[in-house]
Amino acid sequence: MMKLRILAILFVAFAVATSYAFVAPSSGGSDRAVAMADEPKTDEGQKKDDEKGDKEKEAKEKKKEHSYRTKLDARGRKTPAEASQKKPKYKKWKEVLEDATAQEGLFKIWTKREDVFFELGEDQFDKPYLAILSLSKGIGTRFVLGGLPITDLMFDFHRVEDHVQIRMLNTLFRAPDDPELENAIELSYGNSILAQLPIESENEKDKKILVNMNELFLSDVSDMGYFLQLVLDKPARLDSKKAIYRKVKAYAQNVEVDALLTYSPMDRSGLYLPSVPDNRYMELGVHYSIHMLPSEPMKSRLADDRVGYFLTAYKDFTRDGEEDFFVHYANRWRLEKKDPDADISEPVKPIVFYVDHTVPKKYQRYVKEGIEMWQKAFEAAGFKNAIIAKDAPTPEQDPEYDPEDARYNTIRWIVSDEPSFGAIGPSRVDPRTGEILDADVLIEQSMLTSFRLIYRRFAGPQATLMEVDPILTYLADPEIDPEAARRLELEKKLDARMDLHFGAGFSEGLEFLHLALLARGAMEPGMDVPEQYIGEALRWVVCHEVGHTLGLRHNFKSSVSTPFDKLNDRLVVGEIGMTGSIMDYAAPNVSRDRSRQGFYYSPSVGTWDQWAITWGYTQIPGNKSAQKEAEALGSIAGEAHLKEHAYGTDEDTYPAGAMDTLCAIFDLGDDPLAWAKERIGVCQDIFADGKLEERVVGEGGSYLPLRYAVETLLVQEYLAISRAVKYVGGQFTARPHKGDTGGELPMTPVPAAQQREALQFVIQNAFMPGALVLPPEVMNKLADNKIPDWQNPMFAFGRRFDFPLVDWVAAIHNALLVQLMNPMLIQRVVEAGYKADDPYRLSELFSGLTDAIWYNNMTPSGKTAVMQRNLQRIYLDKLVTMTVKPYTGLPHEAVALARLHLTRLQTRIDQASKQGSLSDEAVAHLLESKSRIERALDAKLQAEY
């Protein structure tokens, strides 16, 4: 160990000694160097040495840095010279488009594997285009059906430095020819940025740029995620990794892009979608049709509230001298005469509809006839061959034909797992002018081939009634019934002209016609409905939906144009139509007198249709302003008072505030009460015939059709009875302008005598013992379907296999009382006391209901006792609610009357419950009712009203 230490000391000493020996010699020799090392230095000398040392140190650091950077260069780092050069702003044009294929058209489109690039020039920025979005592939259920429109919007491309914004343009606020106000509008109202896309490359020669459109086309810009939440009641998220293109096509005036998108529900609990293989992944097709708007905007036509057209509206802030800022244009096609001086001329460009290849061959002729039924109306407006039906071309005839291409107006056939809407006729318009640019009609197969509504067996009678009678949706309290709130939101999303309730009501009408034909022996059990009947119905449906595409709204008042006693006169109906307008929802015409049966559905457009088309499409000579043209058309609109021009639309019919007695769906004739009585009579005749089972089931057949027949008859009875409800608290409305001939007032209360008659009709046919009941021998034969499938699971939770007649009757009773005791109806009854000399008073309504439901049958007995007790409970519920927690808008008089009737009823119940001969069920019902009344009378009001 000692030896190792000695060796270490010697090694260190040797190293120190040799370090002196290897000092670099100066010019003065080694001795001089050693001497300088030992010699003390002056201050100036020390300073020079320090400066020299600093320079040497700096040189070493630079050499070290250079060596380090040289090594980094070998790894791909830029040299200092290269780093000083300006970095390219975009990728090279050729680099981006390597292996890409090009299409020339409205935009030059480059496709490269999964990417789609638009090539944009300076002249394409800040220029409005129209985008039309539709579903090209659905899931076959819940309104998510291929072919349905999604939305349409006006947008532009706006460059902001290194990006391009796709802006949805705000067309709602304008100030024509006023730059200062335009600046103010721009300050106050903005656009919506749909996407902001980075510029991929810029062509050095022509300065055109490339943008990758994936962020737009493969995104949820269609808002289908929210739509799925509405229809499924579950939020859904787009899986962007699974988004692909199915088709990208460029044409001279339009671009068609079809994307396949996968959405995943974020919550699958309780979600049952048998039409989707795996409901974790819902595959939807979204089609984008991008159009150049007309370079010369169509001359707009100012709307007139006396004529029913869809509108394009905006606020014009230059109208500060008018009653409001709104301008309304009627939506119309650009139809111009070849010969402007001729009374009747062919158009320069007719409206052409193609009957798509999806329409079954056997129905195509009826579809064409439905389209061209409008020729009659256009001839009244001065046009010949204005609307033409054509077969869709084959690929050989027109390789570019595509029903999703907005250049083609089509009639298409779609299938769905369950009926949704029946048929729809959406159109797309130029938001600047109201010009209709494109339209399509979609028809659901299930509307014709599956008359009965599949969901009946699962949703129950209450849901069925809400489907066929949309007013029940509007009357439901959204706070109490979230399903009603969801339904209303869905209708807003889909569009008013979508005819959501049409499919249900039309299917019920067809089922009733089918049943009537069976009952009359015109068909054998098990037979398909003869094509002539289906064809008649289909022709009417197509004509109705094409009417929407021409700009026309619903006209639910038009049935009053045809006299009730002429409904089965084929000559009269062939000339003026079954109703004044094909835009009505008409019930099938089934005469109680079989020997006088006329058309089942209208064979012609009506008098209102011809008048409305005349107003909308007549060419006014000269180059008049929109205001001058409106004045010239005033003479046509001034004929609105004529009976054959009666008009009332959705808002006059559906909402709780709809008050026009004559605006209703699925009725016929100018006397609604007479029609309702006849329809009830037809239903009762079918029951009373005694051959219903024989005619419907047949020898060896299943009993299931008998069950469907009973459901159909109950729905038809409800629709007829509810038709009378609109008389109570009703008014006759009109749209006169001051100076119009006819002398109509905007509102006239229904005479009290008619209101009393209507209420008695409701009581007699719905509330009296024996109403809405079935022959006992039929009840045990109403078997349900016992063949399982995905729509008919055998082990559905809570499902009943016997027929729930008690539930059906209770649902009808509740639906009728909801309407009769609606706050707005009650408001009108209260205010009628001021308007009329002999008013129908609110006390009459309450007394009429209380007498019929309670006092005239205090202790129900017999087979219908349970139904009567349910009716009493339902009515009592409504009186209690009015007393304890009245609905918003309920007049004070109604609350006071409800309390009065509860007080009187309490006394009567107390007396009745002491009878000794009552059943336990009757006593229990009376005591429970008495207890509820006592609690209600003792309770404090829970709401301000």
Q: What are the roles of these predicted feature ranges?
A:
Residues 362-381, 531-559:
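Conserved catalytic-core segments centered on acid/base and nucleophilic motifs
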Residues 99, 373, 377-381, 414, ...:
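Structured segments of extracytoplasmic/periplasmic soluble domains
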Residues 391-414, 536-592:
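The catalytic-center signature of Zn2+-dependent metalloproteases
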Residues 9-19:
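Bacterial N-terminal signal peptides
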Residues 1-6:
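Positively charged n-region of N-terminal signal peptides that target proteins for export
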Residues 520, 528-533, 558-945:
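Conserved catalytic/binding loops enriched for acidic/polar residues
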Residues 34, 47-117, 121-359, 377, ...:
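Auxiliary tRNA-acceptor-end handling modules of aminoacyl-tRNA synthetases
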Residues 19-39:
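Signal peptide processing junction and immediate N-terminal pro/mature segment
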